Regions:
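N-terminal presequence-like segments and the immediate start of the first folded domain
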Residues: 1-59, 63-76, 82-135
Length: 135
């Protein structure tokens, strides 16, 4: 396979990208920029509900993956940024159910990081991802 240069992907189903790209593809790899629980206009849905925001954020990751020609099954790494670790831990059942909508087996590596705040003050969680086409 011939190497290809980076290609940015910004699907219409995600908020307009200003100063960043939702996904960057280079060769067999895609990097998904941080996705929050927002609709296609950028409005955060369900302020205060980490499970609902997680479900939307992971859906947004899947939208970016598919727009770039990948699937959730191609994901090799997820990074979660949360503003309240206690809320995250207390919601693991609901978070797990939303997670399994996209990742049913072969769970990717992941990292969970607590941060002071995210780009939108109503955002409770942000997810970025890396995916590689599997042979």
């Amino acid at each position: 396979m011939q190497p290809t240069g980076p290609c940015n992907v910004n699907p219409d189903a995600l908020p307009p990208a200003r100063g960043y790209s939702h996904a960057t593809v280079a060769g067999d790899t895609v990097w998904i920029g941080g996705q929050i629980g927002s609709d296609e206009t950028g409005k955060v849905l369900e302020p205060g509900d980490i499970v609902a925001q997680y479900a939307r954020a992971i859906r947004n990751v899947a939208i970016a993956l598919r727009a770039a020609g990948f699937t959730p099954e191609d994901t090799v790494k997820l990074t979660y940024y949360v503003t309240d670790m206690r809320a995250y831990r207390g919601s693991r059942g609901g978070l797990g159910a939303a997670y399994r909508e996209f990742f049913r087996s072969d769970y990717p590596a992941s990292t969970l990081v607590e941060v002071r705040s995210l780009v939108d003050p109503d955002a409770l969680i942000e997810i970025d991802a890396v995916a590689v086409h599997r042979p």
